Amino acid sequence: MNEFQPVNRRQFLFTLGATAASAILLKGCGNPPSSSGGGTSSTTQPTAAGASDLEVKTIKLGYIPIFEAAPLIIGREKGFFAKYGLDVEVSKQASWAAARDNVILGSAGGGIDGGQWQMPMPALLTEGAISNGQKVPMYVLACLSTQGNGIAVSNQLKAQNLGLKLAPNRDFILNYPQTSGRKFKASYTFPNANQDFWIRYWFAAGGIDPDKDIELLTVPSAETLQNMRNGTIDCFSTGDPWPSRIAKDDIGYQAALTGQMWPYHPEEFLALRADWVDKHPKATLALLMGLMEAQQWCDQKANRAEMAKILSGRNFFNVPVSILQPILEGQIKVGADGKDLNNFDAGPLFWKSPRGSVSYPYKGLTLWFLVESIRWGFNKQVLPDIAAAQKLNDRVTREDLWQEAAKKLGVPAADIPTGSTRGTETFFDGITYNPDSPQAYLQSLKIKRA
């Protein structure tokens, strides 16, 4: 797939009536934004035509302080959402469980209208599978990023030099109860979703059954640092900056990046309560247009230093720029020897990748998370088989709204995907996933519960 084109100036002006099109793909302008999560945006964008015609002017989005949240924070702080008439409140969530509970409430009940989600949380909320049977229909509107996740291992295991391929360490991990008095302990931030899937795939590819051979725990991202320091966990899967901070603080090392496991994989997604979207179609498109501009801004190398400064703010990540900026610039240390990849594309990407669109919510990619749920026997009551997964995925993932927003924004037609897949996806262990044949993928896996 060809690299994306910058939004055409004439198309943009014609479509939106804005006074300047340069905000889409230019370097950051103005003074660096404050770290405040409230108040007015520090950068003012030209107001787009139609911005005053929205059904609602406010929305509350939840986020977890990892890089997947960057487009939401940048969209607010750089004024991209305000440009389209929306006052977006970005609300830091203490955990994924808190985000789940708050979206059940909705903003009218003191919660949130949606935000950043691990997959397939929106689909599971839709069916009430993770909300005590209470169905909260959700729509998946866009992918927020690719990559930006890693698996960190304690320095106590530095001599073993765990890496992308675990087969050489299989016996060590299987014999851990005999050598250490307990099973090898690994953690993720929320069960049955992204980071659980990444670490399960990593172990299973190395011939280690994550349900039988090790102990898996749920630990919020911000608590992983202390848990690894005190020896509660041996490794964990979560989003940066936490794996890189483990290495920076010399508590552990990054054994593998999820981008090595599945190059340019889908990461977390923007999803909203379906009732909010259905009630506010114009505001939904405005939100998506602001998000798309924010994602394009985030993808520019020249903006990464300012981006790190914004995200480092106390009300956002509260992590030093010295930790954030190298990751955003692809200077990521991997392995027990701390080798620096020094590859911009190895870090988080937000708008495009060598595989094409990052932002587009390909149904074939959102389906993978449901298929992986079936692999591990998760939520059988709503995911009994592939057909049920496909039906649920088609209901929740809204490619059509992304396409409509992109056209309204003036994104060139060649840069708006028309299909629901990127073709065959290939994992580091040689396994392939063809979204048109998910059953074949499932059958090809050796360790599974299905």
Curated annotation (Swiss-Prot):
GO biological process: monoatomic ion transport
PANTHER family: ALIPHATIC SULFONATES-BINDING PROTEIN-RELATED, NITRATE_NITRITE BINDING PROTEIN NRTA
One GO CC annotation: plasma membrane
Record Gene3D superfamilies: Periplasmic binding protein-like II
Record note on quaternary structure: The complex is composed of two ATP-binding proteins (CmpC and CmpD), a transmembrane protein (CmpB) and a solute-binding protein (CmpA).
Keyword hit for Lipoprotein: no
Membrane-topology annotation of the record: Peripheral membrane protein
The organism's place on the tree of life at top rank: Bacteria
Protein name: Bicarbonate-binding protein CmpA
InterPro entries: NrtA/CpmA_ABC-bd_dom, TAT_signal
Modifications after synthesis and translation: Predicted to be exported by the Tat system. The position of the signal peptide cleavage has not been experimentally proven. The N-terminus is blocked.
Similarity section: Belongs to the CmpA/NrtA family.
Classification via SUPFAM superfamilies: Periplasmic binding protein-like II
PROSITE patterns, per the entry: TAT (PS51318)
Expression induction or repression: By carbon dioxide-limited conditions, probably via CmpR. Also induced by growth under high light intensities. Repressed by iron-deficient conditions.
